[in-house]
Amino acid sequence: MRWWDVEPVLGLERVLFPEDAWSAGLFWSELAHARGPGATRRYLVAEAPGDGGGQSLVGYGGLAAVGGTGDIQTIGVLPSWRRAGLGARLLGELLATAAEFGCHEVMLEVRVDNAPAQRLYERFGFTRIGMRRGYYQPGNVDALVMRLENPAAARTPSPPGPANPPDSVNSSDSSPTSTNPPQGTKTHG
């Protein structure tokens, strides 16, 4: 994710998480830790060809990595792009990043009422380890805590959905890395 991605990501964030969307300040703070030799964050965006020949944001994701533990901070996919494998691609890129950062485990929280996301994480090998009561506010929704040990060995499942996911996923400091990118979309950091 680059500075010019913050506004489009905020727009999608508000659509996806209307009750507890991240603020611009929070994204800027995260991006401040995504550069340089001491970087502890990586944020990705996925884009598809938009109207008028430009690119349109269709997804994003972020990881924090400190002390050998990675934490999936966020993953969001435009509703019309769900079940196309984009969430799996973003998650796979974030797990590869966790391995690059030397993480021995990756943690995340997911809403207890978000069964599709839970299934995605379980397909990658995440296990349920706990619950955070009232974690998501203001709705007072509980969070399921999940963990993946050894992200370097994580299995990357095949996407369950239709074709046409993004061509590539780019991070905050790299170029597209997919060896078999789907047609029509690109990602960048």
Regions from the language model: what does each represent?
Residues 3-4, 8-82, 91-101, 149-153, ...:
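Acetyl-CoA-dependent GNAT
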Residues 25, 107-109, 122, 127-144:
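Conserved catalytic-core motifs of GNAT/GCN5-like acyltransferases
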Residues 77, 111-112:
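Short amphipathic helical patch at the helix-1/turn junction of helix-turn-helix
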Residues 85-87:
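Conserved G/P- and acidic residue-centered "switch" motifs that form tight phosphate/ATP-binding loops
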Residues 91, 113-117, 134-139:
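Short glycine/proline-centered loop/turn elements that form peptide/ligand docking sites
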Residues 101, 119, 123-124:
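Structural motif
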